Amino acid sequence: MKPDITFYRRFQADILAGRKTITIRDDSESHFQPGQRLMVGQYEDGRPFCEIEVIGVTPVMLAQLNAQHAAQENMTLDALRSVIGEIYPQIERLYVISFSLVRALAG
């Protein structure tokens, strides 16, 4: 089964434990809707590992990222800004996708 959204493998444990409850994406992934259930896979190999439900999608400027966003990503604000800069260089307008874990998949 092809995932609807992917995350780097390093984030899998935090998602499954409920420590990571948002993801910050660019315009290409801003189309998700509240209530939508997504199959989640690892970015590296596409292997599905859970299902999440989208709670909301909110636009945010890179400069507006704050400590609350960092806590929801389970990292420091400096680490969050660094990761976002690596993944989305030169992009200022982003989208916060908040989600909850529906179920983990047997692996």
From Swiss-Prot:
Residues 6-102 form the ASCH domain. It comes from Edwardsiella ictaluri (strain 93-146). InterPro entries: AC4CH, ASCH_domain, PUA-like_sf. Catalyzes the hydrolysis of N(4)-acetylcytidine (ac4C). This is N(4)-acetylcytidine amidohydrolase. Its EC number is 3.5.1.135. Keywords: Hydrolase. It holds the Pfam family ASCH. The keyword Chloroplast does not apply. The active site is at residues 20, 23, 73. It is an enzyme of class 3 (hydrolase). GO terms for molecular function: hydrolase activity, acting on carbon-nitrogen (but not peptide) bonds, in linear amidines; N4-acetylcytidine amidohydrolase activity. Belongs to the N(4)-acetylcytidine amidohydrolase family. It catalyses: N(4)-acetylcytidine + H2O = cytidine + acetate + H(+); N(4)-acetyl-2'-deoxycytidine + H2O = 2'-deoxycytidine + acetate + H(+); N(4)-acetylcytosine + H2O = cytosine + acetate + H(+). CDD domains: ASCH_yqfb_like. GO terms for cellular component: cytosol.
